[in-house]
Regions:
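Surface-exposed extracellular loop regions of Gram-negative outer-membrane beta-barrel proteins
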Residues: 236-237, 290, 335, 355-403, ...
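Transmembrane beta-barrel wall of Gram-negative outer-membrane proteins
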Residues: 93-117, 135-186, 208-225, 273
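Extracytoplasmic beta-strand/coil segments of soluble accessory domains associated
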Residues: 1-31
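Gram-negative outer-membrane beta-barrel transporters
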Residues: 320, 422-424, 443-527
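C-terminal beta-signal and adjacent terminal beta-strands/loops
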Residues: 118-120, 124, 130, 517-533, ...
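N-terminal periplasmic accessory domains that precede
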Residues: 11-14, 40-43, 58-86, 388
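Outer membrane beta-barrel strand-and-loop segments of large Gram-negative receptors
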Residues: 258-262, 301-305, 309-311, 392-396, ...
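Short acidic/polar hinge/loop motifs at secondary-structure boundaries
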Residues: 30-56
Length: 617
């Protein structure tokens, strides 16, 4: 509970009312700047070599910087086990495989790779994804122009590759090397005719994240362990948009280079107390550029921030295991601004008896890298977000404060959990929120305050498991110059969100059903009486209305069988949006040349089937 996506994408995850860029996503300790394929509809992380995924919404360990909304820590296997494992398979979007190969007693290689089949096989799944991605994009809009376009052709593909090399020099000295690349590429040909002469030009967009890291783990004795890590994460978004109708071309790029050093030490004082401490250095370089040839226009910006962080925390577990506490302090120093940011954090849990447990979490956080959303100056109408760096003036450092208290009940395979939270995030910019009303072109600095309750219920039976999550929250903006300084609902203010799910297992067959519901996101309506002779729309009270509520039902089934004594296989089928419900994800308005107003909507995926087959060795 408390985690959803208002637009059905993995590249726009909203945690307790935050935007996606406020989530710190780590792959083996390396920050990732891209989390989705197919512009957010497919996860960019191959699940078959992910050993553990930890999600923290509050009370985060002080070893994590950034991520004022959450931390999503994806970890690959980090220990040698001398077992060979491999697998390969396909579905209606991609093919892929993985291998975990022991080279010797002291060495192991892990490899995984996926590639889409969308550029040479057209499937029903791809058809639905295509409609969803290109809806209201420049490509669809070009087809609605003056009729000069006679043909167009898009070619899209994605791939990801990850490699991890494990080498144990001795029992107490371990080296780990990581490499991963995530890539999306789109080419779009547009042909027009003028005086019987055909002209074809190509637009393209490429989005990629490449990361590499080296880690050294040292066990000094049974109590002291240290880790040193070097990493580099680069992100590139390049687009060329050739507009035949209006006779211009636009070249855009957004580039990030993130280099870091991490030192961490863990000291076991005794069986109940551990001390963690460390140092981190980060250098982030963000570049944005844009060039138009008709009329000639060029813009370029480049910012670099270097930060240093020291941290320390104590982790305590009582002898009877009833009380757990983690208390720490992180101090960030931003070299460019000469400023310190002090971030205390705490997580305390206490068992009242065998069934009930109380929990208190609190944290301070800050981050210097965020995303801005420019709906008029986007990448081909598809990717509207670009990474930017704080300049401590127009783009301040984002700071958050959060606290929550929860109670949990666990008995007879029944889990009941309730958590009340309060979160205040300051330093956001209006350009990062994606306004599509009277504030679309405004640039102001403000905050949002979200408060609510997350509830989770899970019951397990012999062959059946069911759970329900419910979140109630209110989320309001406050900007000094917007809405006369009065608070108004956040663009992702989802008051109610419910998820129901059930999994049934019988022998080698597994079937799952899920239902997702949430109330509609805020909407600003145009005024009935518009001013004449203007080039803008007159709007009513900001975010005072709501789009229709969202409801989706999914179903999936998997059958597992043996092919040989050492080989097994799985066959699966899934249907997203089983009842083909038409959900509105977004609604906004544009002004036509004749001063009339048109309403545009973004629709959810329709009924989307998928079939998979995998072999495991």
């Amino acid at each position: 509970p408390g985690i959803l996506s208002v637009d059905e994408t993995v590249s726009n995850i909203n945690v307790r009312g935050g935007t996606h860029d406020q989530n710190l996503i780590l792959w083996d300790g390396i920050k990732m700047y891209q989390s989705g394929h197919f512009f957010g509809l497919v996860s960019a992380f191959n699940p078959y070599l992910s050993k553990q995924i930890n999600v923290s919404k509050n009370g985060t360990s002080v070893r994590y910087g950034d991520g004022v909304s959450s931390v999503i820590d994806i970890q690959q296997p980090n220990a040698l086990d001398q077992d060979f494992k491999a697998g390969a398979g396909f579905n209606l979007l991609n093919v892929g495989g993985f291998a975990k190969v022991p080279v010797s007693e002291k060495m192991e290689v892990q490899v995984s790779a996926r590639r889409s089949i969308t550029d040479f096989i057209y499937t029903p799944t791809y058809d639905q994804y295509l409609k969803r991605v290109f809806e209201n994009s420049d490509f669809n809009n070009s087809q609605q122009n003056s009729g000069t376009t006679v043909s167009n052709n898009e070619r899209f593909y994605f791939y990801d590759v990850s490699t991890k090399f494990l080498y144990d020099l001795t029992d107490s000295d371990q080296f780990r090397f990581n490499f991963a690349t995530i890539n999306n590429k789109l080419n779009y040909d547009e042909t027009s005719t003028s005086e019987s002469v055909a002209q074809t030009l190509e637009s393209n967009l490429e989005q990629k994240n490449l990361v590499t890291g080296l880690q050294y783990l040292k066990y000094w004795n049974s109590n002291l362990t240290t880790t040193a890590q070097l990493y580099l994460s680069t992100y590139n978004l390049d687009a060329t948009n050739v507009n035949l109708t209006d006779d211009f071309s636009l070249i855009q790029e957004n580039k990030v280079r993130d280099f870091g050093v991490k030192l961490h030490a863990t000291n076991h004082i005794d069986t109940n107390l551990k001390l963690h401490s460390g140092y981190q250095f980060t250098e982030v370089n963000v570049r944005n550029s844009e060039a138009v040839d008709n009329p000639n226009f060029n813009s370029f910006s480049k910012l670099i921030n270097r930060s240093h962080a020291i941290y320390s925390e104590a982790e305590f577990t009582s002898a009877n295991k009833n009380t757990y506490a983690r208390i720490g302090l992180r101090i960030n120093y931003i070299d460019k601004f000469g400023e310190f940011f002090t971030e205390p954090r705490i997580a305390v849990s206490h068992k009242l008896n065998n069934e009930f447990r109380l929990e208190f979490l609190a944290e301070f956080k800050s981050q210097t890298v965020s995303q801005t959303i420019d709906l008029q100056d986007d990448f081909l109408g598809i990717e509207k977000r670009r990474w930017i760096l704080s300049d401590n003036e127009e783009i301040p450092i984002i700071e958050s404060k959060q606290a929550s208290v929860g109670i949990h009940y666990n008995k007879n395979k029944l889990l009941l959990s309730a958590e009340a939270f309060l979160k205040d995030v300051d330093g956001i910019t209006s350009r990062s929120q994606g306004f599509q009303n009277q504030y679309q072109f405004q640039n102001d600095i403000g905050s949002y305050l979200t408060k609510g309750v997350d509830i989770l219920v899970n019951k397990q039976f012999d062959n059946f498991s069911a759970w329900m999550s419910y979140s109630f929250s209110s989320n309001d903006y406050t900007f000094e110059t917007l809405n006369d300084g009065n608070s108004f609902p956040n663009n992702v203010d989802i008051r109610h969100a419910v998820t129901l799910a059930g999994i049934y297992n019988i022998d080698a067959f597994k079937v799952a059903v899920g239902l997702n519901y949430h109330s509609g996101k805020p909407l600003t309506l145009p005024l009935e009486n518009q001013s004449s002779g203007t080039s803008t729309i007159d709007y009513d009270v900001p975010n005072d209305e709501r789009i229709p509520n969202y409801l989706r039902t999914d179903v999936s089934a998997i059958y597992q069988f043996k092919m040989t004594n050492t080989t097994k296989a799985t066959v699966g089928i899934s249907i997203w949006n089983l009842f083909d419900r038409k959900n509105t994800l977004n609604r906004y308005y544009i002004l036509n040349d004749d001063e009339s107003i048109s309403q545009l909507e973004s629709q959810s995926l329709g009924i989307t089937p998928n079939v998979s087959f995998r072999v495991w060795f």
